[in-house]
Design a protein with these regions (language model features):
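Surface-exposed, charge/polar-rich loops and edge strands
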Residues: 2-13, 17-27, 166-182, 191-194, ...
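Aromatic side chains
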Residues: 88, 97, 122, 189, ...
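Conserved alpha/beta enzyme-core scaffold
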Residues: 120, 182-184
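Conserved residues at the C-terminal ends of beta-strands
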Residues: 97, 185, 244
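Short Gly/Thr/Asp-enriched flexible loops that form oxyanion-binding sites at enzyme active sites
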Residues: 105-111, 193-207
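Short glycine-rich anion-binding loops that position phosphate/pyrophosphate groups of nucleotides
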Residues: 100-102, 187-191
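N-terminal active-site beta-alpha-beta segment that forms phosphate/nucleotide-binding
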Residues: 2-65, 70-177
Length: 244
């Protein structure tokens, strides 16, 4: 019987190939729909107070296996009560990511968040010596709208960059507990909200450092949904997954 790591490796190969096979026009359309739902959930109704995230009822048809459906899958394992939500008197901060290859692209949501007055941060990978010292494989850096095209960690998202190698005034480091929301990439997911990443452990390390009030949302295409995602003890389910 295959061990968990082999199962994960095989599933990554299958799902990425399936994702890559989607026509570019379809990926663009799906990403636009995902960004629309992200905007609705995080910008229009920051903590979805009109819905019961702890129930099995989905907000739309997200449990359908049809690739034309879209929806929000609330995990039954990690609800975040509305009475714990932080005040939004200050500028809110959301972490997103720069899409690579055929990934669902949150760029349109990032623009909408900036226009709504949110601060937007992107992951910056850290070199191995700094990983050992801080326990994180990445940090989050704020990027202004007019700086996005020049940010080296956006142009090359997997490139490790020392935390002191970049101008901290231009790209300020944001601690995990400052994030009000985080948009998480994934390779595969299931109905329980289990996420399969790329195997580097970046988000497995980062997610536990977030504030309890941070709203965590994974995004993906419906083609990335599987009946069961293999998992280890260190893997995390996501409270919400938006798919299209």
């Amino acid at each position: 019987m295959e061990d968990i790591s082999e199962q994960k490796r095989a599933l990554r190969h299958i799902v990425i190939a399936r994702r890559d096979a989607l026509p570019i026009e379809e990926r663009v359309h799906k990403s636009a729909e995902i960004c629309r739902q992200l905007k609705q959930e995080l910008l229009d109704d920051p903590f979805n107070t009109s819905s019961d995230a702890s129930s099995d009822t989905v907000l739309t048809s997200s449990l359908s296996t049809s690739s034309s459906s879209s929806g929000i899958l609330p995990s039954t394992q990690q609800s975040r009560p509305s009475d714990q939500h932080r005040s939004f008197d200050r500028a809110k901060t959301v972490g997103v990511y720069a899409a690579m290859g055929s990934e669902a692209d949150p760029a349109a949501f990032a623009i909408a968040a900036e226009q709504a007055g949110w601060r937007v941060a992107y992951p910056c990978m850290l070199p191995s010596d700094e990983v050992e010292s801080c326990g994180q494989r990445m940090c989050m850096r704020l990027v202004a709208a007019n700086e996005r095209q020049d940010a080296p960690f956006i142009l090359r998202p997997t490139r490790p960059i020392s935390i002191n190698a970049l101008d901290r005034e231009r790209y300020p480091v944001v601690s995990a507990n400052e994030l009000d929301a985080l948009v998480v990439p994934l390779v595969a997911f299931d109905a329980d909200g289990m996420r399969l990443g790329y195997g580097g452990g970046c988000y497995d390390c980062f997610l536990p450092a977030l504030a309890p009030t941070c709203k965590i949302v994974g995004i993906a295409y419906e083609e990335q949904r599987f009946e069961r995602v293999p998992s280890d003890a260190h893997d995390h389910t996501l409270p919400y997954i938006i798919s299209a």
